[in-house]
Structures are given as structure tokens and as C-alpha cells.
Amino acid sequence: MPSQQDEKRQAAREVIDILHEISTLLNTHLDRTELSLCVSLIENGVNPEALATVIKELRKESSQSRGLVGGE
């Protein structure tokens, strides 16, 4: 018989799997680990809109820095 902890872990995996499917449909380019981290941050009180803004800014900066490296 699975323990309550195992059941919680399985339920969490299923939630992340569903979120990953939605994420893929929306072309967010977030993997399961990144989604899991985002969920944890939101559960701990981080504003989801602020988190989305930070992710977009980090991606923008990353693509700009890759452009600089590739252009040299």
C-alpha cells in the first residue's frame, strides 16, 4: 500500500505533467524543472505576473548577450 507521501508525490508529478502539456501548447519553452520551480515560487507568495516579467527579461538579456558573442 502506497504511503500518503508517495501519493502526494505522484499527484504533484501529475500536476507538473499537465502544466508541461499546457506549457508546450503555449510555446513557453519551460521544461518540467523550470515549471516546478515556478509553481513553488508562486505557492510561496511570488506574484505570477512579476515572475513572468522576470522570465521574459532574463530571456531577452540572454538572447542579446548571445547576439553579442555571435557577432564578434
Curated annotation (Swiss-Prot):
Cellular localization per UniProt: Cytoplasm, Cytoskeleton, Microtubule organizing center, Spindle pole body
Main location: cytoplasm
Keywords from the UniProt entry: Cytoplasm, Cytoskeleton
Cited InterPro entries: MZT1
Coiled-coil residues: none
One GO process term, biological-process aspect: microtubule nucleation by interphase microtubule organizing center
Pfam families in the cross-refs: MOZART1
UniProt GO cellular component terms: cytoplasm; gamma-tubulin ring complex; interphase microtubule organizing center; mitotic spindle pole body; spindle
Annotated family: Belongs to the MOZART1 family.
Job of this protein: Required for gamma-tubulin complex recruitment to the microtubule organizing center (MTOC).
PANTHER family registered for this protein in UniProt: MITOTIC-SPINDLE ORGANIZING PROTEIN 1
SUBUNIT field: Part of the gamma-tubulin complex.
Protein name: Mitotic-spindle organizing protein 1
